[in-house]
A protein has these predicted regions:
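Auxiliary, metal-adjacent structural segments of Zn-dependent hydrolase domains
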Residues: 54-116
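Generic alpha-helical secondary structure signal
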Residues: 27, 38, 48-50, 55, ...
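Classical Sec-dependent N-terminal signal peptides that target proteins to the secretory pathway
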Residues: 1-21
């Protein structure tokens, strides 16, 4: 009986111990391990219960159901598996947190990058149509935060037509559509027109997500996007010369 009690006590204590260990790593409560044995050494966690973050507790996300988690993990893993361990290390990304209905100050968002904690929070209930591409959009934000000295927003803005101006912030504009333009004219999507950093992330995500043939065709037809793509290519080489897309 004493042995059985000891085993039951160990099982009872193991779950909060794991949660505490994860919290100490990335300062997000209520997480549990989903997968940690991956080729590129990314660690995947999920929200076992809803959590709130930030000094004002304005970052909120809920726990997903098992079926959604299984489905979306496969999609996330497939897309992030394109990145090598070395590349992820250079952009400072190690932990993926999966939850649903992610919001900041009641504004829903696809993801929240935190290069300091080496973490990317992803909303697995984000719009199905754009979900895969948006994963790479958020990866760029991690890289941008880690290498702000490399990605110069003023230099980037000069690629656009002289009369074009970005908004002050991504939530200060009605340019929110992620639908790819049929005629790009310097921008992949309406959301690209919000801020320089969002434009960079949209260019990067399309570079990764679209077929090479389609990217090459866009480059031939759109000189502004050709310059933007070349810029992203060259800056990534400064971070990891071995990376290909």
């Amino acid at each position: 009986m004493n042995l059985i009690r000891a085993i039951l006590l160990l099982i009872f204590l193991s779950t909060p111990l794991k949660a505490n260990t994860i919290y100490n790593l990335i300062k997000i409560p209520n997480l549990e391990i989903y997968e940690i044995n991956t080729k590129n050494k990314l660690r995947y966690f999920y929200a076992a219960r809803p959590f709130q973050l930030g000094t004002q507790k304005n970052i909120v996300c809920s726990n997903p159901n098992k079926k959604d988690l299984e489905l979306k993990y496969k999609i996330i893993h497939k897309n992030l598996n394109r990145y090598s361990y070395d590349y992820l290390k250079k952009i400072n990304l190690k932990y993926i947190v999966m939850c649903e209905n992610l919001s900041i100050s009641e504004l829903y968002t696809a993801g929240i990058p935190d290069n300091i904690m080496k973490t990317l929070i992803l909303d697995i209930k984000f719009n199905e149509k754009y979900f895969e591409r948006v994963i790479h959009h958020e990866v760029f934000h991690v890289m941008h935060l880690q290498h702000k000295n490399i990605f110069n927003e003023e230099e980037w803005a000069k690629f656009n037509n002289f009369e074009f101006k970005y908004a002050e912030c991504s939530t200060c504009t009605k340019n929110i559509s992620l639908e790819k333009y049929q005629e790009t004219n310097g921008f992949f999507t309406e959301y690209s027109k919000s801020t320089a950093s969002e434009d960079m992330a949209e260019v990067y995500s399309h570079m990764i997500f679209l077929e090479k043939k389609e990217i090459n065709q866009i480059r031939k037809l759109d000189p502004i996007l050709n310059n933007k793509i070349s810029y992203i290519e060259n800056k990534i080489k400064e971070i990891d010369n071995s990376f290909t897309y």
